[in-house]
């Protein structure tokens, strides 16, 4: 199974990471603010 078999998988991979990375960063900053306030 090669990574460059279908461009759709690459596009889906980019889309998932484009949505997942800011979400994880957003949740991380929220938890950090929660700990800082307490």
UniProtKB/Swiss-Prot annotation:
BP terms from Gene Ontology: photosynthetic electron transport chain
Protein biosynthesis recorded as keyword: no
One Pfam family in the UniProt entry: Cytochrom_B559
Membrane topology type: Single-pass membrane protein
Keyword Transmembrane helix: yes
SUPFAM superfamilies with a match to the protein in the record: Cytochrome b559 subunits
GO molecular function, one term: heme binding
Cofactor(s) recorded in Swiss-Prot or TrEMBL: heme b
Keywords carried by this UniProt record: Chloroplast, Electron transport, Heme, Iron, Membrane, Metal-binding, Photosynthesis, Photosystem II, Plastid, Thylakoid, Transmembrane, Transmembrane helix, Transport
Transmembrane stretches, start-end: 13-29
Disulfide bond sites: none
Family note: Belongs to the PsbE/PsbF family.
NCBIfam families, alphabetized: cyt_b559_beta (TIGR01333)
Function: This b-type cytochrome is tightly associated with the reaction center of photosystem II (PSII). PSII is a light-driven water:plastoquinone oxidoreductase that uses light energy to abstract electrons from H(2)O, generating O(2) and a proton gradient subsequently used for ATP formation. It consists of a core antenna complex that captures photons, and an electron transfer chain that converts photonic excitation into a charge separation.
Entry protein name: Cytochrome b559 subunit beta
Native organism: Ostreococcus tauri
The encoding gene: psbF
């Amino acid at each position: 199974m090669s990574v460059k078999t279908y461009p759709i998988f690459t596009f889906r991979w980019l889309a998932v990471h484009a949505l997942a990375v800011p979400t994880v960063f957003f949740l991380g900053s929220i938890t950090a603010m929660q700990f800082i306030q307490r």
